[in-house]
């Protein structure tokens, strides 16, 4: 009994001491400074923080510049980039894809491409020393044979891998007529797959090898082919190209977007332009004007992204300005900034980005592919201007409801592109393409949570039939730990941070056990410093890594947003939320009064490829700290009109 009393006294002391240590003046100070930073970063009525994939894509770009004859006009500076690679190489010789503070070694494909670039321009002793270390590391990881299929496709285009050792992509999957409508791949794969697949299919069909000076990589093989790399380009008729090839070319041209991209991505655009280069060399009388225009526009698009004013040389994948603007507008509005001052920014975004009777695109050149996640949080922003957008709001809500999958959850771009096409799922796995990208666009809990949050701002509640289906989806997909695997952010921490606030906005009873399980998950995963963090390896080995990693400000904000919805349930939750808020303040000071993520927090392709989203650190901490401040001052609204999983009213207050 004596030990129990001592434990209770110590526990109460800890709770009270941490509560008292969160200085609300410091909270407001951090909020004000971040608001000022955000105002200083507005350009042309948008916030723009390009997401990036890492330097390996700039290494690739060096070779693509040679193919496209752009070296004389590109902003690429070989001296600068070479020094950058030498400085970022790990001691073991590897390079990371994007920054990950939880790992002390790199990624194989990134290391192969960076090695290849350095070997191709090798002009000083420092490079040779870096190559020796990298070569040893690559071979230890299994060599070129162990790289992803996408890497092998790119190596094959430069004679470093045999096309015949890669699976053939049949061209009939790009046909729509007759019986082929059942195998038309555009209607089956995710939006982000198709513009890459069309170009890869072309290069594989032609077995294209570009005749440009590149370094030989035979030393990176474990078992280099006895007869060398087989170079066997397909025979062709200049005047009479294959009809299937022309159908593929027509499909590719349909992907061209207003700013010059093919599909809105830098990588798909470069692969497409390289395909055009090959096609033009074989059939110079066809598509002359279209291809010339594609070169001109494509050059602008790629250079704009790869050497932009904010993330130059980081390998920016695309333009995501509407997503960035949504997030930061939301953060600024919620934290009390002047609505009228922000209105021109929101008005511009709605005018330029929101598609009529649909959703909003992720950024420039995504007009053809509205994004449900972005649209869900756009609703939150538009809720501050209901009168100004009284026409757009109901149309946007109607579109969102139309995009719900049969399982109750939400995809990113396309309804009905779950993994239930077993034939294509098997084919992509057999071809090895599934080891380079996510092929389908299934429902995901993070998007579904954001959409619930947006709909909740317009009075939709947990008794609405479609929202009941969303809740059933969340319950069904919850894992044994009480969390979910997130699709677009790392990872189980992010999912709880999206699901719980979404449930709260639609007045769902957060006392239900399955929701409590997700809160308990967070309590068990909080780091000693008060923050939350999670390594990207949680996708590859969830049993070991779920919810584990060094703290970041964005992941801490996600965790805090969930905890705040149940802040008054008990002292343990209060204590955890206080610690998370204190971590944000401490990290803000450590990073010279800025919010910055020291690890990758964005997901491109789970377990394969990751994206860093700089805008997350400019927005989520601001939302989380503002809500924390309001709760601490008794100003945060908790709903009393609650519903259970059957959509029935709950006769008790949530907290």
Swiss-Prot record:
Biotechnological utility: Expression of THC1 in Saccharomyces cerevisiae enables to eliminate anaerobic sterol requirements and provides valuable information for the design and construction of robust, sterol-independent yeast strains for application in anaerobic industrial processes.
Superkingdom of origin organism: Eukaryota
GO terms for biological process, alphabetical: sterol biosynthetic process; triterpenoid biosynthetic process
Positions annotated as glycosylated: 23, 44, 69, 77
Family indicated by similarity: Belongs to the terpene cyclase/mutase family.
Function: Squalene cyclase that catalyzes the oxygen-independent cyclization of squalene into tetrahymanol, a triterpenoid sterol with five cyclohexyl rings that is involved in membrane integrity, permeability and fluidity.
Record protein name field: Squalene-tetrahymanol cyclase THC1
């Amino acid at each position: 009994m004596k030990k129990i009393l001592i434990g209770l006294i110590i526990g109460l002391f800890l709770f009270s001491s941490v509560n008292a240590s969160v200085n609300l003046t410091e909270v407001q100070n951090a909020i004000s400074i971040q608001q000022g930073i955000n105002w200083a970063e507005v350009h042309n009525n948008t916030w723009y923080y390009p997401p990036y994939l890492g330097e390996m894509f700039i290494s690739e770009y060096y070779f693509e510049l040679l193919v496209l004859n752009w070296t004389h006009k590109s902003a690429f500076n070989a001296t600068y980039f070479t020094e950058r690679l030498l400085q970022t190489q790990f001691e073991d010789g590897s390079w990371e894809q994007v920054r990950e503070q939880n790992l002390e070694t790199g990624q194989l494909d990134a290391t192969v491409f960076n090695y290849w670039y350095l070997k191709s321009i090798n002009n000083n002793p420092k490079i040779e020393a870096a190559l020796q270390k990298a070569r040893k590391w690559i071979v230890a990881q299994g060599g070129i044979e162990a790289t992803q299929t996408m890497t092998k496709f790119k190596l094959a285009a430069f004679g470093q891998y045999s096309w015949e050792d890669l699976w053939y992509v049949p061209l009939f999957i790009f046909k729509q007529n007759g019986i082929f409508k059942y195998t038309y791949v555009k209607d089956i794969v995710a939006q982000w797959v198709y513009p890459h697949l069309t170009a890869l299919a072309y290069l594989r069909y032609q077995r294209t090898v570009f005749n440009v000076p590149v370094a030989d990589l035979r030393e990176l093989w474990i078992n280099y082919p006895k007869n060398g790399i087989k170079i066997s380009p397909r025979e062709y008729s200049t005047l009479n190209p294959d009809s299937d090839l022309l159908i593929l070319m027509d499909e590719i041209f349909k992907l061209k977007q207003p700013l010059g991209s093919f599909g809105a991505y830098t990588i798909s655009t470069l692969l497409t332009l390289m395909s055009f280069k090959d096609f033009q060399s074989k059939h110079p009388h066809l598509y002359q004007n279209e291809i010339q225009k594609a070169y001109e526009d494509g050059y602008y698009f790629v250079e704009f992204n790869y050497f932009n004013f904010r993330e130059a040389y980081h390998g920016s994948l695309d333009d995501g300005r509407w997503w960035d603007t949504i997030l930061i507008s939301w953060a600024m509005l919620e934290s009390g900034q002047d609505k009228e001052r922000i209105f021109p920014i929101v008005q511009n975004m709605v005018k330029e980005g929101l598609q009529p009777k649909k959703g909003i695109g992720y950024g420039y050149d995504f007009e053809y592919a509205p994004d449900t996640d972005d649209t869900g949080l756009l609703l939150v922003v538009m809720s501050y201007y209901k009168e100004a957008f009284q026409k757009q709001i109901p149309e946007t809500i109607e579109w969102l409801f139309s995009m719900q999958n049969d399982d109750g959850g939400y995809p990113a771009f396309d309804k009905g592109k779950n993994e239930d096409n077993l034939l294509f799922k098997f084919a992509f796995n057999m071809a090895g393409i599934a080891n380079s990208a996510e092929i389908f666009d299934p429902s995901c809990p993070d998007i579904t949570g954001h959409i619930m949050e947006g709909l909740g701002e317009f009075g939709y509640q947990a008794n609405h039939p479609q929202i009941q289906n969303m809740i059933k989806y969340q319950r069904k997909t919850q894992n044994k730990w009480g969390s979910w695997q997130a699709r677009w952010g790392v990872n189980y921490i992010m999912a709880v941070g999206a699901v719980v606030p979404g449930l709260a906005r639609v007045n769902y009873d957060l006392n239900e056990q399955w929701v409590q399980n997700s809160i308990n998950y967070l309590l068990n995963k909080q780091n000693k410093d008060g923050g939350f963090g999670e390594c990207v390896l949680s996708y590859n080995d969830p049993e070991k890594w779920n919810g584990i990693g060094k703290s970041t400000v964005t992941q801490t904000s996600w965790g805090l947003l969930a905890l705040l919805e149940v802040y008054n349930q008990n002292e343990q939750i209060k204590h955890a939320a206080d610690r998370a808020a204190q971590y944000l303040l401490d990290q803000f000071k450590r990073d010279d009064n800025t919010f910055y993520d020291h690890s990758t927090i964005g997901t491109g392709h789970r377990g394969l490829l990751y994206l860093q989203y700089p805008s997350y650190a400019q927005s989520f901490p601001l939302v989380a700290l503002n809500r924390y401040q309001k709760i601490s001052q008794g100003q945060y609204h908790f709903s009393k009109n609650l519903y259970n999983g059957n959509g029935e009213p709950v006769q008790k207050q949530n907290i």
